[in-house]
From Swiss-Prot:
Gene that encodes the chain: dan
Modified residues (Phosphoserine): S251, S254
Subunit and partners: Homomers. Interacts with itself, danr, ey and dac to form a complex (or complexes) containing the RD factors.
Domain annotation HTH psq-type: ranges: 7-58
Residue ranges, compositional bias (Low complexity): 372-381, 570-586
Gene3D superfamilies per the UniProt record, alphabetical: Winged helix-like DNA-binding domain superfamily/Winged helix DNA-binding domain
Domain of life: Eukaryota
Single GO molecular function: DNA binding
Protein name per the record: Protein distal antenna
Annotated Pfam families: CENP-B_N
Length: 678
């Protein structure tokens, strides 16, 4: 019984090793009372309190005394004590009377004194290592009445099944058993024979072991999602090759056959090999060196990829990336980061379902630019529940990109090429059709006062300016067809009051042309044409008979600019051209400006009112392509134009002599304001 008598008449003292004392201290740390532990191991409670005070010293002694011989000898002593009883009815020791047996099992000389080292647990410190497992003789003789049936299996395959905390119980939750140090204390549950799991150590040490295991075996890193697997996921396990663990005869009940019907547990998850597994839930890229072909998942497994986590077999080396992707996958957020667009698109994607995305949906699976991660969906399509959020992000990005003229040009080019079969008036907008014209117009825009007509547009697009109607078509339609707003074209658009209507039809974001063909937008476009017609008529001083040709439409101010004595033919230096006009004592410009300011006040107000009406209609509109960002931008734009339009009127009434120059300056500042708002 391993109990020696001291002097006659004193209580029997147990010769406990430091390992036994540390085990008792650990039971106290795990929540048992000192009294119950002292009663179990047969020492006074005061002695146990003294052990707790000297815990560090005992741990050091336990580390020093942990040798193979000690383990085998201590086990032999315990076995010899009950050997005469044979099979479980014998005297003391491990196979003592049934009512005492459970208490003595807790004193097995397993070492729990320090952090678990896998090699030591497998080979040195296991109490059953001294037995011969080559035959079943010892198993039959010992009977294992007090031990769970697969204790020997746990001892043999300990590297693959380190989480031994009663995880083979059918009703046990595997993830709870894996992390709870109290999950298998049978003085709380009384369900199994062993009084305490060999791994029921403190929570901090068990967490350390979990982290260490996750580093050693990356297949365990996805353990957090064990419960989301279906109960029949046991077929995901693949048996570990027999050469990798110490070859020992398993316990009488076969390890794999007994638990094949149970759910995926931490033990068999650890056994799963990345390369094997017919139905493992991953998009593995096989034969990378040979063919590099992508193995797309089978259709039966594809639906579960939205909710369940993936294995690590195909991941890139970055663990942080894997963690992010697995969190997204478990939360069902995978469509927030769609696969890259395979067409080589350099501009922000056009919102909603444009031909870009339609061509993307046609390819299954999509052409990836990187190895597929768990968050990429098999078909490249967007999940419906997140499509609105994704569209909002795209719209916001596109509206921000319109501030960059290069990105805007690319977006306009791309939208035009994608929709040439739909667009009927694309040929009229010369600045849309020809890339060289777009570049030229971007480089040669002028920022003249509103009375000056754009020379560059007249000179390079003579065929588009045959009549005022077609000229205005060319101005308004590209805006409606998805061309981002021309931020510096002051001469092309006659007055800032027209821009709300142009924007309300185009909404400052690359859009398909089909969207703009609603009755409201066509009405506002025709009204805009009429207003511009009236302005051109009054500026040129022509009669209203017949359409205005470009030669007649170019006003006398343009004639003064085309004069050979005028050195500023590039139309880019505003102050120089104004000074040149004044030096030549050409009074027609100032008179026309005064006329223009008088006659357009009512038309500006009317146009702004139309813009506000259209804004109200847009707010009540249920078209999903109209985003809140666009409405906010349009609201700010109209407000900026209103403020920039009222200040010239006030200054004009206050200073009638200098009305022309002040009005020009104020309108320029108003335009700068709206440009800043955008």
């Amino acid at each position: 019984m391993n109990i020696r008598m001291g002097t006659k008449g004193k209580r029997p003292l147990r010769s406990l090793t430091p390992r036994d004392k540390i085990h008792a201290i650990q039971r106290i740390h795990d929540g048992e009372s000192k009294a119950s532990v002292a009663r179990d191991i047969g020492v006074p409670e005061s002695t146990l309190r003294g052990w707790c005070k000297n815990e560090d010293k005992l741990r050091f002694m336990s580390r020093q005394s942990a040798t193979d011989n000690l383990c085998a000898d201590a086990l032999g002593d315990k076995m010899d004590g009950g050997g005469g009883g044979g099979g479980g009815a014998g005297g003391g020791g491990l196979l003592g009377p049934p009512e005492k047996r459970q208490r003595l099992d807790g004193a097995l000389p397993l070492n729990f004194s320090n952090k678990l080292k896998f090699d030591e647990l497998a080979f040195k410190r296991s109490p059953l290592n001294g037995l011969d497992y080559s035959t079943n003789k010892n198993l039959a003789d010992l009977g294992y009445n007090g031990l769970p049936v697969d204790y020997a299996a746990f001892n043999g395959g300990v590297k693959a099944k380190v989480f031994g905390a009663d995880i083979n119980r059918p009703a046990a939750d595997p993830s709870l058993n894996a992390i709870s140090p109290l999950s298998s204390l049978t003085h709380l549950s009384g369900l199994t024979g062993i009084s305490q799991s060999p791994l029921a150590i403190s929570f901090n040490e068990l967490t350390t072991n979990l982290n260490l295991l996750a580093q050693l075996n990356p297949g365990l890193a996805a353990m957090s999602g064990l419960n989301s697997f279906p109960a029949g996921a046991g077929n995901l396990r693949t048996p570990k090759p027999s050469g990798q663990t110490p070859l020992q005869v398993q316990s009488p009940r076969s390890d794999s056959g007994d638990r094949s019907a149970q759910g995926l547990s931490v033990k068999n998850w650890a056994k799963q090999k990345p390369g094997e597994g017919q139905g493992s839930l991953n998009l593995s890229i096989k034969n990378e060196g040979k063919g590099g072909d992508i193995k797309s998942p089978s259709p039966s497994i594809a639906p579960s990829q939205m909710g369940g986590p993936m294995t690590l077999s195909n991941l890139a080396e970055d663990p942080l990336l894997y963690w992010l992707k697995s969190q997204q996958t478990m939360l069902g957020l995978n469509p927030l980061y769609p696969p890259t667009i395979p067409m080589g698109v350099t501009s922000p994607p056009i919102r909603s379902s444009t031909p870009q995305h339609m061509s993307q949906l046609a390819q299954t699976p999509p052409i990836p630019s990187a190895p597929l991660t768990p968050s990429s969906t098999p078909s490249g399509s967007l999940d419906e529940k997140n499509a609105a959020w994704y569209n909002w992000c795209k719209a916001f990005g596109a509206s921000l990109h319109t501030l960059n003229p290069n990105a805007a040009t690319l977006a306009a080019l791309q939208a035009n090429q994608l929709q040439q079969q739909v667009a009927t008036t694309a040929a009229e907008g010369g600045s849309m059709g020809d890339p060289s014209n777009i570049l030229y117009s971007h480089l040669t825009k002028e920022t003249e006062t509103p009375s000056v007509r754009s020379l560059s547009s007249n000179e390079q697009n003579p065929e588009a300016d045959e009549a005022t109607e077609t000229d205005l078509d060319g101005e308004v339609e590209p805006e409606a067809s998805g061309k981002p707003e021309d931020l510096s074209a002051a001469g092309k658009v006659m007055t800032p009051s027209q821009s709300p209507i142009a924007h309300s039809s185009g909404s400052r974001s690359p859009e398909p042309k089909a969207k703009t063909k609603t009755p409201e937008t066509t009405n506002s476009t025709s009204e805009c044409k009429k207003i511009l017609d009236n302005m051109l008529f009054k500026m040129g001083g022509m009669e209203a008979t017949g359409p205005l040709m470009p030669e007649q439409g170019s006003s006398e101010s343009e004639g003064s600019f085309q004069d050979t004595s005028n050195p500023h033919t590039n139309n880019n230096d505003v102050s120089a051209s104004n000074n040149n006009n004044n030096n030549n004592s050409n009074k027609t410009d100032e008179e026309e400006k005064a006329k223009y300011l008088d006659c357009t006040a009512d038309e500006d107000i009317e146009a702004i009112r139309h813009g506000e009406k259209f804004l109200q209609w847009l707010e009540n509109c249920s078209n999903p392509r109209v985003t809140a960002v666009q409405l906010m931008q349009l609201r700010f734009l109209i407000a900026a134009i209103k403020s920039g339009n009222e200040t010239p009127m006030i200054e004009k009434s206050a200073l009638p002599e200098d009305s022309e120059e002040h009005a020009a300056e104020e309108e320029g500042s108003g335009r700068g304001k709206s440009r800043r708002r955008k």
